[in-house]
């Protein structure tokens, strides 16, 4: 801090020490420095759940997902009643080293809310929308898992929260939806939100109800072109399987590819029992103006009932 005009740079604030819950609270503003014109090197490390009034003058925000984090609550809850602004989306980081994929279900991803401010969060710095310049949704990827970080409105302004979701896009061969899972809108075995190739996944539905759809593989891409700000169009699916062996679904897909350039090959649906009240697709390219190819996909009906069409 300075009462003058000098630089306040290279400063670090840690919320929590990774070994236990942050039991304190800060009603006021946590600042990396007092000079908003130069925040170089000012870093806020969020190591567990914390409530503070607001934050300002940080170049970098680092969220460490470790065992002390309660995923039922936002890691950084901003309660002061004013917008949190002038953040740099390009300098927001998440440490996922301790994550293993635990918590990912067939009907919902692993999810943690990184930060929340009901009064608003903005990644606009002067004339720069750093969210667009940073390519939109951020990601961390391992061999089979992806973690997608995005604002609640997928924009750099007007957001109220930033969350991270985890998906398995490859090799999820034991995914199951059973009677104990009850009723949900949809379930999947392999899924990407950032255009990865979804491959080698199998979902077996043996009970319960899915009111929208069941997917062997589901492909989306929420990343953006850094220059144009437009959503990217890549992402494909191969060798995914949906097995309907009981329960009820609406539509069923070996793979649903929602990217314009994406293709689908060698995906499979088998129906041996249960009911599909809608349509069944070996694979479907569902993006408007889809340019990819759907080849070598298979549907086998051995039992059960399909009310709609089979493609």
Question: What are these model-derived regions, one by one?
Answer:
Residues 12-13, 75-78, 106-107, 111, ...:
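Well-ordered, non-membrane alpha-helical segments in soluble/globular domains
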Residues 28, 54-60, 80, 86, ...:
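Extracellular/lumenal ectodomain signal focusing on beta-strand-rich modules
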Residues 8, 19, 24-25, 39, ...:
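Small-residue (G/S/T/A) turn/hinge positions that recur once per unit in extracellular repeat modules
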Residues 1-6, 29-39, 52, 100-104, ...:
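Tandem-repeat/low-complexity and Cys-motif detector
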Residues 17, 23, 27-106:
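Extracellular beta-strand/loop-rich repeat segments of large surface/secreted proteins
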Residues 13-15, 22, 26, 30, ...:
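Fold-core signature of tandem repeat domains
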Residues 1-4, 148-214, 241-249:
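N-terminal segments that cap or nucleate solenoid repeat domains
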Residues 96-181, 188-190:
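Outer-membrane translocation/initiation segment of Type V secreted surface proteins
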């Amino acid at each position: 801090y300075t009462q003058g005009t000098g630089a306040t740079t290279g400063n670090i604030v840690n919320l929590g020490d990774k070994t236990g819950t942050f039991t304190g609270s800060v009603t006021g503003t946590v600042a990396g420095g007092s000079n908003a014109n130069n925040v170089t090197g000012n870093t806020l490390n969020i190591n567990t759940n914390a409530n503070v009034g607001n934050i300002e003058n940080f170049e970098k925000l680092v969220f460490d997902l470790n065992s002390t984090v309660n995923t039922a609550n936002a890691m950084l809850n901003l309660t002061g009643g004013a917008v949190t602004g002038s953040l740099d989306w390009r300098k927001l980081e998440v440490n996922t080293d301790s994550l293993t994929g635990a918590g990912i279900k067939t009907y919902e991803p692993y999810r943690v809310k990184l930060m929340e401010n009901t009064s608003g969060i903005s990644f606009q710095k002067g004339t720069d929308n750093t969210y667009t310049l940073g390519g939109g949704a951020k990601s961390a990827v391992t061999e089979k898992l992806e973690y997608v970080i995005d604002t609640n409105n997928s924009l750099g302004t007007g957001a109220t929260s930033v969350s991270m979701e985890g998906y398995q896009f490859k090799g999820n061969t034991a995914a199951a939806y059973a009677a104990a899972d009850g009723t949900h809108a949809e379930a999947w075995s392999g899924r990407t939100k950032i255009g990865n190739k979804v491959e080698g996944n199998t979902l077996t539905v043996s009970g319960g109800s899915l009111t929208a759809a069941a997917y062997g593989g589901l492909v989306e891409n929420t990343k953006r072109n850094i220059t144009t700000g437009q959503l990217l169009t890549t992402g494909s699916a191969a060798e995914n399987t949906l097995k309907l062996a009981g329960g009820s679904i609406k539509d069923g897909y070996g793979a649903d590819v929602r990217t314009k350039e994406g293709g689908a090959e060698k995906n499979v649906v088998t129906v041996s029992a249960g009911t599909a009240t809608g349509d069944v697709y070996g694979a479907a390219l569902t993006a408007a103006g889809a340019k990819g190819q759907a080849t070598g996909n298979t549907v086998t009906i051995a039992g059960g009932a399909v009310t709609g069409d089979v493609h």
